[in-house]
Amino acid sequence: MTSRRGRAVGFIRDFQAFILKGNVVELAVAVIIGGAFNKIVSSFVGDLVMPLVNPLIPGGDWRTAVIGPGLKIGSFAGSVIDFLIIAFVLYLAIRAIERFKRKEEAVVAAAEPDVQQQMLATLERIADNLEAR
């Protein structure tokens, strides 16, 4: 009985450590946000872009285009366009985040002198003190 309880407690501790890792939590948040973002992009394409594009396409709504015996080429093309829009927006977001990180790192690097500069300043103060004596 004790060994079962010990294994159960060990399992629970391992599971808790796994869940509390930053990567797992971040991944869960990313999946949830990604699902919501998918709805936004689908609405953007379906409700804003396609009503502008459909009049230019002979036959109207291209998402319902079928080739041969049921090959839904329009639906596939729509999924590809949705993917490209999502990928492009994510690229822009990641690029903006990276630019912000670089600026932040530059500010931190400029604010903190490196070790050699600190040592040089300390040596100069020591030399000034010795000269003053």
Curated annotation (Swiss-Prot):
Stretches that traverse the bilayer: 17-37, 73-93
Coiled coil (residue ranges): none
Pfam family, one: MscL
Membrane protein topology class: Multi-pass membrane protein
Domain of life: Bacteria
UniProt keyword list: Cell inner membrane, Cell membrane, Ion channel, Ion transport, Membrane, Transmembrane, Transmembrane helix, Transport
S-S pairs: none
InterPro entries, per the entry: MS_channel, MSC/AndL, MscL_channel
GO cellular component: plasma membrane
HAMAP family for the chain: MscL
Primary role: Channel that opens in response to stretch forces in the membrane lipid bilayer. May participate in the regulation of osmotic pressure changes within the cell.
NCBIfam families for the chain: mscL (TIGR00220)
Self-association and partners: Homopentamer.
Family: Belongs to the MscL family.
Protein name: Large-conductance mechanosensitive channel
Organism encoding this protein: Synechococcus elongatus (strain ATCC 33912 / PCC 7942 / FACHB-805)
